[in-house]
Amino acid sequence: MEISESAERKAWDQWIFLILTMESITELNNKTQGQLLGGNDLALFQSILLTAFSDWIPVIEAVKLLFIELKDRKKQMKYSEKNCLYCYYVPLTTPEVSTIFAGYGINLIGNTAFLSYRAERYPQQSLSDKIASMCMQILISNDHAAEAQEVCKRLKEYRCRGYLTGMFSNDRWIGGNQKDIARLIEKESGYPVFFLEMDFWDSNNL
């Protein structure tokens, strides 16, 4: 099946707009230390990036509306400092995690799994080039030092009490690196890292 250049361009523009709007929502929530979206709300919202849709227009419109509503809510809320942890990935499939922390007055914000950073730029002639460039900028697909450095920046920027990671002991690709990165974060930032030894997909071992 051939896809026209105009269709490719339209799809790319829609995707970029969605990504930028979602990043704006996440940053807004992070700056309020999770007082706009709870950990489970954040996880559900970010699951859009893991979902396939036949038509992105309704999704984009819903995300745009959410951004407007959250900005309005922020204007009306009385701000106060909250205890929060920056999280590798708030586990959407085990909502008990966020609920337990919330019960102790700790908000979960983040997530590192969706962060990107500035990588070396290459010529982007086609849609495939653009997608490849985007993949190269995914933080968790790069080296440990880069991931730890970016996390440290956010711990300071959002005035977090520490970093919450783990939850992927069942995954050799993701889980195998987490303890090394956790040590780097503690060494570089001085922030405590809390490590949950559990299965991201299964709450039975909480």
Language model regions located:
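Short acidic-aromatic active-site loops that bind/stabilize oxyanions
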Residues: S141
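A charged, amphipathic alpha-helical module
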Residues: M1-E120
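Detector for methionine-enriched segments
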Residues: M1, M22, M77, M134-M136, ...
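Short, flexible active-site loops
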Residues: E81-C84, K130-I138
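Hydrophobic alpha/beta core scaffold segments
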Residues: I100-T112, Q124-K130, Q137, A145-L206
